[in-house]
């Protein structure tokens, strides 16, 4: 689960990380009150969307007067931002964050992420802040320092020193950055976050370190332990089909292709998307119905797929605990309930797959069955291309 920048900064401040003073604005009627809370000649107006790249898209504006700030807020609220992290349709700006300007001497990057390969938390630090860390890692890998924290021992003082060892930083700078690294590590553990990122972490002329921008992503599977964090969820920033899918235990991710996919199992779903691309088409979604799909979930899965503009649907089911004949009956019932006006190719394998295939073939419905995944993908791609 993602949250907005202003929410991430509020969490960081609770753990002792310094952030600029700011105020959130949802409508023009709140602007004067928000500006009055700030005591700075420079006001930064920031669009609050769940995507990076806001600055280049006009979503971050530095204003030197209240009138400039008001004009920027008026232009920004209700507008649509298109960045490299949004879809081509962009995201609507429903709220903006006003922040006091900051005296910037130097920009750094620091983050904590879950390192699944090492089963540890990795702290990443760079003296090159304010840009994508992937770009820095590509052009100047020596400037990106990674320190892995064993959860058995937690963050130790030497971890902070190791982060700054080759960065030509003073003892005071090292101490302050180490302190921030320890704090974001505590944020990770305390909130079950997958990622805590400060970019840029700025050093002011007075030697203070401030989180100028922040991003936190939480583990959805651990949200039940954090009702306070669940309250931060902004459904307006999420894809409505993904929200609807979660109500029925479906794992759905919208994509930009034109062939809808319904699969059981995440690995099989990814393989299905790969083979669709192999035959020259693009998947419209990732959809894992799980191992206990019922007629109801299959029906809802079809509805969610068809809510997007798809030219065809590929159903790929492996019957293990879930028998293929039950799935076939669910598919038939779902099609009879909701009219599917696009080509549908179904591949069944596993327990009772012969019976399931026969049920589909004998149903008199417009269903094309396939014997294996390659045949199924080839068929749906070629039908859609005609």
Curated annotation (Swiss-Prot):
Cross-referenced InterPro entries: ATP-grasp, ATP-grasp_succ-CoA_synth-type, ATP_grasp_subdomain_1, Succ-CoA_synthase_bsu_CS, SUCC_ACL_C, Succ_CoA_ligase-like_bsu, Succinyl-CoA_synth-like
Positions contributing to Mg(2+) binding: 199, 213
Catalyzed chemical reaction(s): succinate + ATP + CoA = succinyl-CoA + ADP + phosphate; GTP + succinate + CoA = succinyl-CoA + GDP + phosphate
Cofactor binding, note field: Binds 1 Mg(2+) ion per subunit.
Domain ATP-grasp: 9-244
SUPFAM superfamilies: Glutathione synthetase ATP-binding domain-like, Succinyl-CoA synthetase domains
Residues noted as binding ATP in the record, renumbered to the chain: 46, 53-55, 99, 102, 107
Subunit relationships: Heterotetramer of two alpha and two beta subunits.
The family this protein is said to belong to: Belongs to the succinate/malate CoA ligase beta subunit family.
Protein name: Succinate--CoA ligase [ADP-forming] subunit beta
Organism: Ehrlichia canis (strain Jake)
């Amino acid at each position: 689960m993602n949250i907005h920048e202003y929410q991430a900064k509020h969490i960081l401040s609770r753990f002792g990380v310094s952030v600029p003073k700011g105020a959130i604005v949802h409508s023009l009627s709140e602007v004067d009150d928000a500006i009055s809370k700030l005591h700075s000649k420079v006001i930064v107006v920031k669009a609050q969307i769940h995507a990076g790249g806001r600055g280049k898209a006009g979503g971050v504006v530095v204003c030197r007067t209240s009138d400039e700030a008001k004009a920027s807020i008026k232009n920004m609220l209700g507008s649509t931002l298109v960045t490299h992290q949004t879809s081509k349709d962009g995201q609507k700006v429903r709220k903006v964050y006003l922040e006091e300007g900051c005296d910037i001497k130097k920009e750094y990057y620091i983050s904590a992420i879950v390192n699944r390969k090492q089963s540890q938390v990795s702290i990443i630090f760079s003296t090159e802040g304010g840009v994508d860390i992937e770009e820095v890692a590509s052009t100047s890998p020596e400037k990106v320092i990674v320190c892995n924290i064993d959860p058995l021992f937690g963050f130790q003082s030497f971890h902070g020193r190791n982060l700054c060892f080759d960065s030509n930083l003073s003892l005071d700078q090292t101490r302050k950055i180490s302190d921030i690294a320890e704090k974001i590590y505590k944020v990770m553990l305390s909130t079950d976050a997958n990622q805590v990122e400060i970019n840029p972490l700025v050093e002011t002329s007075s030697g203070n370190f401030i989180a100028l921008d922040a991003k936190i992503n939480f583990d959805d599977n651990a949200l039940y332990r954090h009702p306070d964090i669940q309250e931060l969820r902004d459904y307006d920033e999420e894809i409505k089909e993904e929200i609807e899918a979660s109500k029925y235990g479906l794992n759905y991710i919208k994509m930009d292709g034109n062939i809808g996919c319904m699969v059981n199992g995440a690995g099989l779903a990814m393989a299905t998307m790969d083979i669709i691309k192999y035959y020259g088409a693009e998947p419209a979604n990732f959809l894992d119905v799980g191992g206990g799909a019922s007629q109801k979930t299959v029906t809802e899965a079809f509805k969610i797929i068809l809510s997007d503009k798809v030219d065809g649907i590929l159903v790929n089911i492996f019957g293990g605990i879930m028998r293929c004949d039950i799935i076939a009956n669910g598919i038939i019932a779902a099609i009879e309930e909701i009219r599917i006006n696009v080509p549908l190719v179904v591949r069944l394998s596993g327990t009772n797959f012969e019976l399931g295939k026969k049920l589909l073939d004998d149903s008199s419905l417009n269903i094309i069955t396939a014997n294996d995944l390659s045949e199924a993908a080839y068929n749906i791609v070629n039908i859609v291309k005609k």
